[in-house]
UniProtKB/Swiss-Prot annotation:
GO terms for molecular function: amino acid transmembrane transporter activity; amino acid:proton symporter activity; glycine transmembrane transporter activity; L-alanine transmembrane transporter activity; L-proline transmembrane transporter activity; proline:proton symporter activity. The gene is SLC36A2. GO terms for cellular component: endoplasmic reticulum membrane; extracellular exosome; plasma membrane; recycling endosome membrane; vacuolar membrane. Residues 26-36 have a biased composition (Basic and acidic residues). Keywords: Amino-acid transport, Cell membrane, Disease variant, Endoplasmic reticulum, Endosome, Membrane, Transmembrane, Transmembrane helix, Transport. Residues 80-81, 170-197, 244-264, 318-349, 401-404, 459-483 are extracellular. It comes from the Eukaryota. Belongs to the amino acid/polyamine transporter 2 family. It is a multi-pass membrane protein. It catalyses: glycine(in) + H(+)(in) = glycine(out) + H(+)(out); L-alanine(in) + H(+)(in) = L-alanine(out) + H(+)(out); D-alanine(in) + H(+)(in) = D-alanine(out) + H(+)(out); L-proline(out) + H(+)(out) = L-proline(in) + H(+)(in). This is Proton-coupled amino acid transporter 2.
Amino acid sequence: MSVTKSTEGPQGAVAIKLDLMSPPESAKKLENKDSTFLDESPSESAGLKKTKGITVFQALIHLVKGNMGTGILGLPLAVKNAGILMGPLSLLVMGFIACHCMHILVKCAQRFCKRLNKPFMDYGDTVMHGLEANPNAWLQNHAHWGRHIVSFFLIITQLGFCCVYIVFLADNLKQVVEAVNSTTNNCYSNETVILTPTMDSRLYMLSFLPFLVLLVLIRNLRILTIFSMLANISMLVSLVIIIQYITQEIPDPSRLPLVASWKTYPLFFGTAIFSFESIGVVLPLENKMKNARHFPAILSLGMSIVTSLYIGMAALGYLRFGDDIKASISLNLPNCWLYQSVKLLYIAGILCTYALQFYVPAEIIIPFAISRVSTRWALPLDLSIRLVMVCLTCLLAILIPRLDLVISLVGSVSGTALALIIPPLLEVTTFYSEGMSPLTIFKDALISILGFVGFVVGTYQALDELLKSEDSHPFSNSTTFVR
């Protein structure tokens, strides 16, 4: 089963309705397992060229869009944790490695599609067939666990995104509401204002829960693309306004450390990996292209654009605000109506994007669950699982209300596995029997070791910071936590 973020356009979308009485979309997929591939034949996809599909430009836009979320707003704080020189350089290196690992995944998937005469292969299937191709008998016998491991990390990653979104929504809405009485029309000075205390940020998280429940009950991916389009527009406008502001009156950079303490670097690593975690969208995009032979070039171009945007936003944001930078750069904007509207636009965009991120774990878990019950219980079970999952993300966000640490934790735990650890190992298992140079094996081992070290150290550091903050401020709001 292909599981990914939406890459379809809104064409042909019907009126928005919950459609709770029809069978779940996942149930229909179980009844017709070949429906995913529409009318394509294996011979058509073997040539990597289709009569229908997205163009090169559309694939580029979708790839860039898949990397734009809350992660980019947290990168200035990440650079603070690494240093004004070390941070951008590390982002450049990590962007190159992440792009290389995406190329590895595409190369391995194309090899198995050609070898097995299949039209499409998702991340989990590619890893499973990679283990089957390995000469080790034990790995061959347990190859199906490769797909399960990928599915597990995809679930953790996407639900982690959802938790980050809830914390982001609460932090930004809380700041807007508290500053509403002192908001001015003067956008040229970022004066310190006395905020009017309101309810705890955790209550803001709960206030979003009914809207999130309604969104996740929309099970038609084509309808969700409407929300995707609205989210893209609102976030694009917000990013343009933010970049316009931070490029004004940049202070002297010499006051900032070139290299920060090594103790905070793991937090940078987790946040950076979180931002580059779009490897799950790569194979579905490649499959949807009219001519997939162009995809490697599109992947390189798209990730170059994304890396440049990340470095620019991260460096300029840290230069502009220095040690006062917060977990999301939107929280540093002046207290005028223009920049308050930026927060509201981003809130609307993230709220719409939540359903698309939620779609991925839902389409992994729900088909597995409803395949074990009768047809009459398929719909109630589908809706119940969605309700439990969205409540779980809200509960986790309430338990861990620090936006910067949630981002770093999600990136360290699951982002490193999907983006850095698994792809190099997959290349070894796929091509080892065909002969690989020692240099390639060394390169793959080095990347996987780097990912594993980042996984262990980044997770430990994020949890340690979280426990320290809870001990110091057990009942504080999340905005108080932001340094």
